[in-house]
Amino acid sequence: SALASASSWTIAMVVPNLSEAGCSEMFAGLQQVLQPAGYQIMLAESQHRLEQEEKLLETLLASNIAAAILLSVEHSDTVRHWLKNASIPVMEMGAMRADPIDMNIGIDNVAAMYELTEMVIQRGYQNIGLLCANQEQWIFQQHLQGWYKAMLRHHLSPNRVINAAMPPNFSTGAAQLPEFLLAWPELDALVCVSDELACGALYECQRRRIKVPDDLAVVGFGDSDVSRVCQPPLTTMAVPHRKIGIEAGKALLERLNDGDWRDHKPIASSLCLRESC
């Protein structure tokens, strides 16, 4: 039917939440490549609920889409099974996975956390802590792997870790700093898995008159908007979300034009050195 052939120019993108870090940038990168080629992206939010993602994909897969795009997050076995057996390209983007459904483009979280921790160590800090908060279990494992690798390489204790069962936001960062100082008064640097956590920790430092970076260095992850405006400006790891979107768009386009998918090297993340470390 005319509708069926028309909808095969539609690519479905399911994300947990549009306000997710870097999501709109990745979407813009995809649009930049796919729109001029005649494809429309239909965007749907699963609100971090696996059963909602299942419902959305069940509907979308029944409507003759050209391809499916997901963020590199946990998917249910049902979704993985459907997508592996669907005769369309599937792109997971954002971070590299050990077990992608099909195509996968993103940063290497292990390498990024290793590089960030290594930089803190090279600056002379030794009593370093790692603050994590609610995030995908496999991303937490990857961050932990990079952290352990850097700390153990320099024979430093990797045990100052708090994984808070709270969202990775400002208030969690502010609430967890006292916990670190209570457990490890010798703490001289804090690595945070998001800029929001790091900025929350900075607010708490100001409240307690802890000088950053003289008394305590703080670094974040993501190079979000807030990292440039907090006081002092935050040293962080930049994730090139738009580039990830562009590369994912190009790879999808090639595949849709009957090209092959060759495993893609991770997209490099880069250190942003500012005043907090």
Annotated model-derived regions:
Residues 13, 70, 192:
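Redox-cofactor binding/interface segments in oxidoreductases and associated redox assembly factors
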Residues 15, 72, 94:
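Flexible glycine-/small-residue-rich
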Residues 17-19, 47, 74, 243, ...:
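Residues that cap or initiate secondary-structure elements
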Residues 29-40, 55, 61, 77, ...:
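Bacterial carbohydrate/catabolite-sensing allosteric modules
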Residues 45-48, 67-70, 106-108, 167-169:
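Short, flexible loop segments at the rims of nucleotide/cofactor-binding pockets, characterized by
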Residues 47-50, 71-76, 196:
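Short beta->alpha connector loops
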